[in-house]
Amino acid sequence: MAIGKRLKKIREGIDRTKLYPLDEAVKLVKERAISKFDETIEVAINLGVDPRHADQMVRGVVMLPNGTGRTVRVGVFARGAKADEAKAAGADVVGAEDLVEQVQAGNINFDRCIATPDMMPLVGRLGKVLGPRGMMPNPKIGTVTMDVAGAVKGAKGGSVEFRVEKAGIIQAGVGKASFDADKLVENIKALADAVNKAKPTGAKGTYIQRVAVSSTMGPGVKVEPGTVH
């Protein structure tokens, strides 16, 4: 099927001007995830904040009740007993100076990054590499911690980091098209709840302004913001 015809087909039945209840939006998106691979279901939340101001930054981490459906590779910067704990918890890559050198050389074999507090002077050198990828460990989201085992298990088990982008948007994957619709709805509501709890003091007016759900290759479906709470 030609790409144009395919896009026309999957867009049929979606009113681009309508705001759908969350459960209906998820159903529409799932029905149109027709690729040969298991597409990721993604959510975009437009917030009434200006992240250029420090008091309007929104970031955090949420444990999705039904996981993400992704295999997440976790890297841990730790030494000694903490390194052993990380390995036992299932970390894919564990190291100290050696791991710093690997990352500096461009070998990033992980999707999420965790560090013990004592490692941060070393890990701080990697800001230019890990920062743009959104992978820099941060105590505010639990990725700089002495509980490396808990952090590794969380990352593997469905925790999702979120951070508002320059345009005031938070985007996150909340599961796979193969998930039951009610499981996706639960995950989306958990994300929205975490975003609400992370509302900064500097936010004025309507906080959650627009919400849309889509699949990797499918069209976006606009959601009634009030139905995600």
From Swiss-Prot:
One of its GO terms (molecular function) is rRNA binding. InterPro entries: Ribosom_uL1_bac-type, Ribosomal_uL1, Ribosomal_uL1-like, Ribosomal_uL1/biogenesis, Ribosomal_uL1_3-a/b-sand, Ribosomal_uL1_CS. Gene3D superfamilies: 3.30.190.20, 3.40.50.790. It comes from the Bacteria. GO terms for biological process: regulation of translation; translation. The keyword Metal-binding does not apply. PROSITE patterns: RIBOSOMAL_L1. CDD domains: Ribosomal_L1 (cd00403). GO terms for cellular component: cytosolic large ribosomal subunit. The keyword RNA-binding applies. Keywords: Repressor, Ribonucleoprotein, Ribosomal protein, RNA-binding, rRNA-binding, Translation regulation, tRNA-binding. PANTHER family: 54S RIBOSOMAL PROTEIN L1, MITOCHONDRIAL (PTHR36427), LARGE RIBOSOMAL SUBUNIT PROTEIN UL1M (PTHR36427:SF3). Binds directly to 23S rRNA. The L1 stalk is quite mobile in the ribosome, and is involved in E site tRNA release. Belongs to the universal ribosomal protein uL1 family. Part of the 50S ribosomal subunit. This is Large ribosomal subunit protein uL1. The gene is rplA.
